[in-house]
Amino acid sequence: MSDVQQEIDQLVKNNDIVLFMKGSASFPMCGFSGRAVQILKACGVDTKALTTVNVLENDGIRQGIKEYSNWPTIPQLYVRGEFIGGSDIMMEMYQSGELQQVIGGNAA
């Protein structure tokens, strides 16, 4: 496992909710990342409790997260070490109530 992969692995495993995105929760840099943050807020997640990783600040992470998850796009959500998906999957899961259940006790 490369250093970047190890760094990603530690972020995913050591934080309950991790969103790899473009920008930050307070200033998303793309519509999909912004939508992902809004979905999490709608689920009751306090953005202070949310770990976000701005992939625009680190090309290694930007490419590495795609390899780590075998998923080609950003944003990517992880809850308790499990890859959930991008903003489209998050929206589908939110609309069905499944995302709220997955997040569960982590909502603030």
Language-model regions: role of each:
Residues 45-62:
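Thiol-based oxidoreductase modules, predominantly thioredoxin-like and allied folds used
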Residues 4-6:
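Eukaryotic intrinsically disordered and solvent-exposed regulatory patches
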Residues 67-73:
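Thiol/disulfide oxidoreductase modules built on the thioredoxin-like
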Residues 79-108:
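Non-catalytic, surface beta->alpha helical segment in thiol-disulfide oxidoreductase systems
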Residues 9-47:
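Local sequence-structure signature of Cys/Sec-based thiol-disulfide redox active-site neighborhoods
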